Structure formats: structure tokens, C-alpha cells
UniProtKB/Swiss-Prot annotation:
This is Lipoprotein-releasing system ATP-binding protein LolD. Keywords: ATP-binding, Cell inner membrane, Cell membrane, Membrane, Nucleotide-binding, Translocase, Transport. Belongs to the ABC transporter superfamily. Lipoprotein translocase (TC 3.A.1.125) family. Residues 6-225 form the ABC transporter domain. It comes from the Bacteria. GO terms for cellular component: plasma membrane. The gene is lolD. It is found in: Cell inner membrane. It is a peripheral membrane protein. GO terms for molecular function: ATP binding; ATP hydrolysis activity; transmembrane transporter activity. Its EC number is 7.6.2.-. It comes from Nitrosospira multiformis (strain ATCC 25196 / NCIMB 11849 / C 71).
Length: 225
């Protein structure tokens, strides 16, 4: 079995405007091993988010191959891809996507409850991860009662609570001030390292990208070093 957590070969993605094909990704090759931290940078509209969605099984490619833990996902149905995502991956987005009517504890426990974990055990795991991200004192607060940095920390906790093999992060600090962005980014690197998980992060900030183990540039539909 391959040691790669995520890999893709000759990955291609096009969209269509009527009969006109608009290519976005034109032959991406990428391997993400266990514990790797990879930053992907590129101009707005270069296809960074599209690539991340494909790597996470949230979209299907026009051509090429994607494997998550050696499972080829192109031939999977949506239910099978969803199960693989929930079991193997964590996601963090620029906007936290926390459910506003639920507390931080309830939001972070949600992925475990979706897995049908017992409520008490799910809450125990969520509480532990929230303490790790510095929110042990904010368990009963809703997203509206948290600061921007705290909401993003809760989103990081939610991504890590399932102990994923890899976290995919799409501009996770893009909505934060520079100091808070640096703190959240450092926290993600630290927690992923401690958990032995891989991290693929899309960012427009070259200073943050340089903290990753590997930085790749997406331009003209291709990844370069």
C-alpha cells in the first residue's frame, strides 16, 4: 500500500460556459505523505479552491486520478465519497461555517455524532480538542459570542476532532488580522504535527506559506515549486 495520504496524477478540471470549455487545472501531479505540510499559493481565480475541493472528494475531476488513502475516488458514488471524507479528512474554510444556533462544544462534536458516536463520548472528545485550541473556557458560547479568531479556532477543533489523516484548509486565515492569522496558522501546524496528520493549506499569504514544509505555486493550471 502507498504511504501517500492523498495523491493525484494528471488531474484536470474544466468548466463550461455554454459550449465553451474553460480549463482550470491542466495536469496536476501531487503526493501528500503522512505528516506532510503543504502550502499552495496562487493568484485569485487560479484554481486553488477547485484543487482543494477535488483533493477532498467534494467535486469530481474532468480527467486524471485522485487517491485518498489509496482509494481511487473517481469511480465512487457520492455516498461512498462522503463516507471516505468523514472518516479520513478534516476541512477548515475561510469562513468558519459553524452552526450559529449551537455552542462551540456542540459544533465540534457534530462530526462525531454524524458518525453515530455516543453523545457523551463525542462531547468528551470535543471538549478535549477545544481545550487544546485554547477554548476550554468557551464551551457553552455560540459562534456569535466568540471573536473571529476564536471562531476559527473552533473550526480547527472541529476539523481535528475526528483524528483525520489529513486536514484540507482553504484560506483558513484569510478573514483574520495578521497577528491572529499567524496564531491560528501556527496552531494548525502544531496540532497537525502532534496528531501525526498531514495538512494541505491554500493561502494567499506567502509569509504563512513559508512556514509549511513545502510550498507549491498554482499558475496557468499547473503546480510548480
Amino acid at each position: 500500500m502507498s504511504d501517500n495520504i492523498i495523491s493525484c496524477r494528471n488531474l484536470r478540471k474544466s468548466y463550461y460556459q455554454g459550449q465553451i470549455e474553460v480549463p482550470v487545472l491542466m495536469g496536476i501531479d501531487l503526493k501528500v505523505g503522512k505528516g506532510d505540510t503543504v502550502a499552495i499559493v496562487g493568484a485569485s481565480g487560479s484554481g486553488k479552491s477547485t484543487l482543494l475541493h477535488l483533493l477532498g472528494g467534494l467535486d469530481v475531476p474532468t480527467g486524471g486520478e485522485i487517491r485518498i488513502l489509496s482509494h481511487e475516488i473517481a469511480g465512487m458514488g457520492e455516498a461512498e465519497r462522503c463516507e471516505l471524507r468523514n472518516r479520513s479528512l478534516g476541512f477548515v474554510y475561510q469562513f468558519h461555517h459553524l452552526l450559529p444556533e449551537f455552542t462551540a462544544l456542540e459544533n465540534v462534536a457534530m462530526p462525531l455524532l454524524i458518525r453515530r458516536m455516543a453523545k457523551a463520548k463525542a462531547y468528551e472528545s470535543a471538549r478535549e480538542v477545544l481545550q487544546q485550541v485554547g477554548l476550554g473556557h468557551r464551551l457553552t458560547h455560540t459562534p456569535g459570542e466568540l471573536s473571529g479568531g476564536e471562531r476559527q479556532r473552533a473550526a480547527v477543533a472541529r476539523a481535528l476532532v475526528t483524528r483525520p489523516a489529513c486536514v484540507l484548509a482553504d484560506e483558513p486565515t484569510g478573514n483574520l488580522d495578521r497577528r491572529t492569522a499567524g496564531e491560528v496558522f501556527d496552531l494548525m501546524l502544531e496540532l497537525n504535527h502532534d496528531a501525526g496528520a498531514s495538512l494541505v493549506i491554500v493561502t494567499h499569504d506567502p509569509d504563512l506559506a513559508r512556514k509549511a514544509g513545502r510550498t507549491l505555486h498554482l499558475e496557468d493550471g499547473l503546480l510548480t515549486v
